[in-house]
Amino acid sequence: MTTRGFRLDQDNRLNNFAIEPEVYVDSSVQAGWTKYAEKMNGRFAMIGFASLLIMEVVTGHGVIGWLNSL
């Protein structure tokens, strides 16, 4: 039973702790080509491409030329 944000147990004792959400088990397999993995891969690729462009603008050399100068 719930009354005004407080929960009473079966013996009508007050439980003034926070009401916890229902617990569930996600039994689906989360390996391989998931949507989350694809989003993260795309985001890291965009960050890498943008950093290469910034490096080329700052140094004045392309990536291959910069690697040859090392």
UniProtKB/Swiss-Prot annotation:
Gene Ontology BP, a term: photosystem II assembly
Lumenal, thylakoid topological domain: 59-70
Induction of expression: Transcription strongly induced in the absence of photosystem I (PSI), probably a monocistronic operon. Mildly increased translation in the absence of PSI (at protein level). Expressed at very low levels during growth under normal light (40 umol photons/m(2)/s), induced under high light (500 umol photons/m(2)/s for 6 hours) with maximal expression by 1 hour and decreasing after, after growth at 4 degrees Celsius for 6 hours, less induced after nitrogen or sulfur deprivation (at protein level). Upon return to normal light protein levels drop rapidly.
Effect of inactivating the gene: Single deletion mutant and double hliA-hliB deletions are out-competed by wild-type in high light (500 umol photons/m(2)/s). Quadruple hliA-hliB-hliC-hliD deletions die rapidly in high light but grow normally in normal light (40 umol photons/m(2)/s). Quadruple mutants are sensitive to norflurazon. In a quintuple hliA-hliB-hliC-hliD-hemH deletion chlorophyll half-life decreases 2-fold while the half-life of PSII proteins does not change; photosystem II assembly intermediate RC47(1) is missing (RC47(1) is PSII monomer without CP43). De novo chlorophyll synthesis is very slow.
Disulfide-linked positions: none
Highest taxon listed in the record's lineage: Bacteria
Bilayer-crossing regions: 31-58
Record GO terms (molecular function): chlorophyll binding; pigment binding
Membrane topology: Single-pass membrane protein
A matching Pfam family: Chloroa_b-bind
InterPro entries (alphabetical): Chloroa_b-bind
GO cellular component: a single term: plasma membrane-derived thylakoid membrane
Keyword entries, A-Z: Membrane, Photosynthesis, Photosystem II, Pigment, Stress response, Thylakoid, Transmembrane, Transmembrane helix
Subcellular location: Cellular thylakoid membrane
Cytoplasmic side, ranges: 1-30
Sequence motif Chlorophyll-binding motif, residues: 38-43
SUPFAM superfamilies hit by this protein: Chlorophyll a-b binding protein (SSF103511)
Function: Involved in photosystem II (PSII) assembly and/or repair under high light stress; probably important during long-term acclimation to stress. HliA-HliC heteromers associate with PSII assembly intermediates containing CP47 (psbB) and bind chlorophyll and carotenoids in a 1:0.6 ratio. They probably protect against photo-oxidation during assembly. The complex binds mostly beta-carotenoid, but minor amounts of echinenone and beta-crytoxanthin are also detected. Accumulation of this protein requires HliC. The complex efficiently quenches chlorophyll fluorescence, contributing to photoprotection.
Quaternary data: Forms heterodimers with HliC, these are associated with photosystem II (PSII) assembly intermediates containing CP47 (psbB). Cofractionates in an approximately 100 kDa fraction the thylakoid membrane with HliB (ScpD). Co-migrates with photosystem II (PSII); the same complex includes HliB and 3 FtsH homologs. Even in the absence of PSII, does not associate with photosystem I (PSI). HliA/HliB and Psb34 probably bind to a similar site on CP47; their binding seems to be mutually exclusive.
Similarity annotation: Belongs to the Hlip family.
Protein name as it appears in the record: High light-inducible protein HliA
Organism of provenance: Synechocystis sp. (strain ATCC 27184 / PCC 6803 / Kazusa)
The encoding gene: hliA
